[in-house]
Amino acid sequence: LTPLLEAETASKVTFKGLSGMNSERSFGLDKRGYDKSMLGVLGISTGFASTVGINRQTVIDAGVRNKRGFITPKKPEELNNLNTFSMMEALSPLAINHDDPFRTAMAFTQTSQHQMLVKKSMPSLITTGADEALPYLTSNKFAYKCPFEKAVVKEVTKDYMIIEDTKTKQKDYVDLRTTIQKNSDGGFYITTKLDPIVKVGQKLEGNDIVAYDKQSYSNAIGNGGKGGNPFGLSYNMGTLAKVAIMNTDLGYEDSCRSEERRV
């Protein structure tokens, strides 16, 4: 439903195996706890309900060497943001360093799984750069990348785009129509639409973004100015808004009443 959810779903791992294991020993503290050997391989984010510690997220660059799963260990001083943060953690700068573990777990679940695409969404003001890397770490569903090493845009209409490999003359088709997707068994639908950012005759290189969903990405902050990367996009984390919070008897615990009317 969102690029972030796609990235976090692809990086989810569990110690219980492909079909799961419901024996009591698979839910022990030794399985749920965070071990020092996980540093540089797994992020600290996990669910805060019954899945705590059972389902985990790999970091952006987990250092997996091959399909067998062999991992190259690194010393703590050799680690950087890519080796330390999962995608959600990298999209929440400063929070992961200062929040308590329970708040971090809540942020992971609520940010990656409950986030919705809205028209007035914008990138974060303070980032680690992960919001700009996200389009290249996910599929073409929300940001379509050029699949050829060298290519040229042959045709652009309101419904489709055609890209041609300059060497082999192979063509790639990009659907620009509005598509409707269902939220699995959640019972509601979302719409996505890729809008082109290239013109007929424009030359492209591999992984150049040619079209993107404007609800998911934008270049509104930082990378859209003069001299910036014309293909540079940032993930829209949410709506930037000024909010006034007043504690009254209408609130419950850490909740508050929300109204469209502004005073």
Give the role of each language-model region.
Residues 1-48, 52-202, 206-262:
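Long, charge-dense accessory insertions within large macromolecular proteins
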